[in-house]
């Protein structure tokens, strides 16, 4: 089940948003932010205000996902419904690594093994829009705990080292214009 679509349906189609808010003036922005928070790529036809709130919610969701993944991995919970047997020795598929090298999100349909899903979790970092989001992800420490995992598979460990370098490089790239400047007229 697509939890974002269901959340938007429950709140707006079933009317439960009124359990939380009496005023409907922001319904279109809130609905879009909920509906789009888990998509691979945001819709093109968003208004600047919708895009802002979608990006904020998406960043917050990714930061929370890092926490959840650390918790589940420490408890050996099978969050990705893949084979955990000997996961420290599993390979990282070429298609997943190609997306990581591009600093992109990994498409769900390309993930097959635990290590593919793990790399997909690391690549969420590349999709964080705002500098403060990256800062929070690092300050909270969950993303760093994910980065600290080491594989016993020599090829996978080389690829993980490459991803760690890509993360460091992403932190030194020029950041986009800050939110206050970008959306000051909204």
Per-range role (PLM):
Residues 2-16:
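An active-site-proximal "capping" alpha-helix that borders the catalytic cofactor pocket
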Residues 16-18, 39-186:
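Divalent metal-dependent phosphate-bond-processing catalytic cores, especially two-metal-ion Mg2+/Mn2+ enzymes
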Residues 1-6, 24, 53:
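Active-site metal-coordination segments of metallo-dependent hydrolases
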Residues 24-38:
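Short, well-structured alpha-helical segments
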Residues 9, 32-35, 55-58:
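Generic alpha-helical structural context detector
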